[in-house]
Amino acid sequence: MDTDFHRNASKKTLSNTIIDQPTKTWYDSAVTSNYKLRRLRDKFVKSFTIVCVVAVLYPLSSMLYMFVYKGATLISLSTITQPTIGSSSFVSGGLANAIEGTLLLLGIGSSVAVCLGVMGGVYIAEFSRNSRLAKGIRFGVDVLAGVPSIVLGYVGFLLLVIYFGWGYSALAGGLTLSVFMFPYIIRTTELALRKVPDEVREAAKALGSNNATVVNRLTLRFALPGIITGILLAISIGLGETAPLLYTASFSNYVPSALLQSPVGYLTYVVYVFSQLPSAEAHSLAYQASFLLIAIIVTLNFAARVLVQRFSKVT
């Protein structure tokens, strides 16, 4: 009796277990297969993204490592203190003339571009935002930003070197460089000022302030981090230009002594020309110039971050 009772109980338990188990429908199978397909697609996209990132960053990081490593190992005190010696296929010495020429060209170009760019950005953002003149300025700036740098260099050659008779000089090269940097500064200045809320301007005007006071004491302070970032970005871009300076500044092994009728040396020329010369000394100077350019650009970017954080806390 007990045996039959246990057999019947086990049969009932087994039947209940079979009944309680859910049956797998075609919908469940479709959902499962769709989930597996999505996971497979997600893995494929992630793998493809990683491959693309590596394909882009590996050549760039390899070049940076080569320039930084070779330049840092070759650079010495004489690189900064001695000018370049020789010409044509044989060169030696240091890069004092190119370093001073680069700083002089950047000083002239950035001074003109910053003054005109910031004032132009303030005008079209604060005083004439929707006027026809502002729209014309924006259109001209966009067109100027799209002009190749070598075309700007040739125009500078015809206008400054030939027509005005300045010759190959620091002033001709610096002004040509300022035309190249100007669009970046004016557009970033306008964008930085536009990010300031209109409520701030309206509150200041409600207290009796005029437009000039609002701009000088309020909106410029709020937009200063963005303006500084745009200025340093334009300087970094101008630092890497060679084509405009080939037509307007030429190159010289001597430290610049005058703003007119005096060719100027600069680091990008050393990288562009000396790397194609057959001598090992020329290649050494090219690597050292590359290292100095990278160091200056990194310093400018670091300074931009520090200044932006500092002025952001102040405002």
Give the positions of each predicted feature.
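Interhelical loop and adjacent transmembrane-helix boundary motif
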Residues: 87, 245-294
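Transmembrane alpha-helices
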Residues: 211-248
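Transmembrane-helix boundary motif in ABC transporter permease subunits
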Residues: 109-141, 154, 162, 305-310
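Generic hydrophobic transmembrane alpha-helix motif, especially the helices
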Residues: 142-179
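Transmembrane alpha-helical segments of polytopic membrane transport and secretion proteins
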Residues: 2-55, 304-315
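Glycine/proline-centered hinge or cleavage motifs at structural transition points of membrane proteins
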Residues: 148, 207-208, 221
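C-terminal transmembrane helix and the adjacent membrane-cytosol boundary/short C-terminal tail
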Residues: 124, 191-194, 205, 232, ...
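Transmembrane alpha-helix signature in integral membrane proteins
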Residues: 93-123, 231
